[in-house]
Amino acid sequence: KMLEGNHANSKKYNIVCVNCGCNANRLYQEYNKSVIRIEHCDYCGQVVDKYVEFDPVIIFLDALLLKKQALRHILFNSGIQSCWKFTLVLLICETITKLLQKSHVPSSGLHTSKVNWQEPDHVIYSAMEWDLFKYFILSLIELGCFLFGMTVWLLLWKCFVRKDTDLPSATVLLQGLVLSSFGQVFMLPMMLWGLQEHSNVCRILCQIFTFSANVQTTRVLCPVWSFGVSLISVLFGHTLSQMTIQQLSQ
């Protein structure tokens, strides 16, 4: 089924070699329903996309390791048309995480909040509070400012640095950056598994992983950018996002 889906998508989307990033005509040649031949890249000579035969779990694990091959498969060869559902899940997880962290913040200098935010009744009650909607809006603004900063960087590069550079469209770049922010989802299960005492450490680790995934995704989508340019672009986007949130929180 995975092969059939990728074969159908290869007619509609640009296929790239997961090893060198060069364009390819197709992922494989199908002779009949039971006989196929995996295509090799004309530039590097390797298999165009080895992940068409892999289990999704293996692809996910390689994506966790931030391997360029896995990221190219997901971003180019998997035929993802829209990531709005994942964006919504990402925002909801970030909203609940902020709400749980707020519920566990010390209420005074000597005592911590006695609200048991892990109780179902409290979760349902919190859903009707203004804080839930406030944190959702803040999470949306935070993500939007980051994507806006990356878009500005991309447009400035196209206009003033190298106008003839083959860079992706803003839509493709933003979709890839949203997908590469999946590390933020890990914060929620950490909180629910009773790691709220180390929430700050867990959040820092998730932010480091997300930042690294954003940089690696930028390098995959914009191969003409050096590591330094990709690093600065992602840093610019996150800095703009954090500065905006700090101003709104004052």
Predicted segments, located by residue:
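Generic structural hydrophobic/aromatic packing signal, biased to beta-strands
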Residues: C17-C20, C41, I92, G149, ...
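Selected alpha-helical membrane-embedding segments in polytopic membrane proteins
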Residues: G45, V52-A170, L174
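N-terminal cysteine/histidine-rich coordination modules
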Residues: K1-I74
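Intrinsic disorder
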Residues: K11, V35, L61, A127, ...
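Preference for well-ordered, secondary-structure-rich cores of eukaryotic proteins
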Residues: V18-N19, R26-L27, Y31-R37, I137, ...
